[in-house]
Amino acid sequence: MGVLSEFKAFAVKGNVVDMAVGIIIGAAFGKIVSSFVGDVIMPPIGLLIGGVDFSDLAITLKAAEGSAPAVVLAYGKFIQSVLDFVIVAFAIFMGVKAINRLKREEAVAPTLPPVPTKEEELLGEIRDLLKAQNNRP
C-alpha cells in the first residue's frame, strides 16, 4: 500500500472527519463566545465597576520612547480571556452532562424479553414431550 493510499484511507475515516468538523465548529463557537463576553457581559460589569472597559486595563511597565512602543502588561485582556474560557468550559460541561444523561437513560431502559416464535414454541413442546417420555418406567 502506497503512502498516498494510506493517507487517503486515514483522511476519510469517520473519526478524522468528525474531528475536523468539531474543530471548525469549535473555532466558530469560540468567536461567538468571545463576542458574547466582550460585547455583552463585560460592558455591564465595567459599568457597575465604574465605567471601566476591561480590554483597556493595563499597567505600563515602560513608557514609549521615540519609535519604540510602550511596554504594557494588558491584564484586562487576560481577564476577558479567562471569562471566555470559563464560559466555553461551562458550555462544554453542560453538553457532556446532557449526553451522559441520555446515555444513562438508554442503558436504564428496560428491554423486554423477545417473544418466542412459533417454531421456538413448538420446539419447547417437543422437548417437554421427550422429557416426559424419558421419565416413564
UniProtKB/Swiss-Prot annotation:
**Record keywords:** Cell inner membrane, Cell membrane, Ion channel, Ion transport, Membrane, Transmembrane, Transmembrane helix, Transport
What is the protein's given name? Large-conductance mechanosensitive channel
Q: Name one GO cellular component term.
A: plasma membrane
Please name the GO terms that the record assigns under molecular function.
Answer: mechanosensitive monoatomic ion channel activity
Family statement drawn from the similarity comment of this UniProt entry: Belongs to the MscL family.
Task: Please report the record's description of how this protein sits within the membrane.
Answer: Multi-pass membrane protein
Which Pfam families does this chain map to?
A: MscL
The yes or no answer to whether the keyword Cytoplasm is present is no
Can you say where in the cell this protein is located? Cell inner membrane
Main site of residence?
A: membrane
Could you confirm whether the keyword Transferase appears in this record?
no
The annotated subunit structure for this chain is: Homopentamer.
Q: Its encoding gene is what?
A: mscL
Q: PROSITE patterns of this UniProt entry?
A: MSCL
For this protein, the parts annotated as crossing the membrane are 9-29, 79-99
So what does this one do? Channel that opens in response to stretch forces in the membrane lipid bilayer. May participate in the regulation of osmotic pressure changes within the cell.
Give each disulfide bond as a residue pair: none
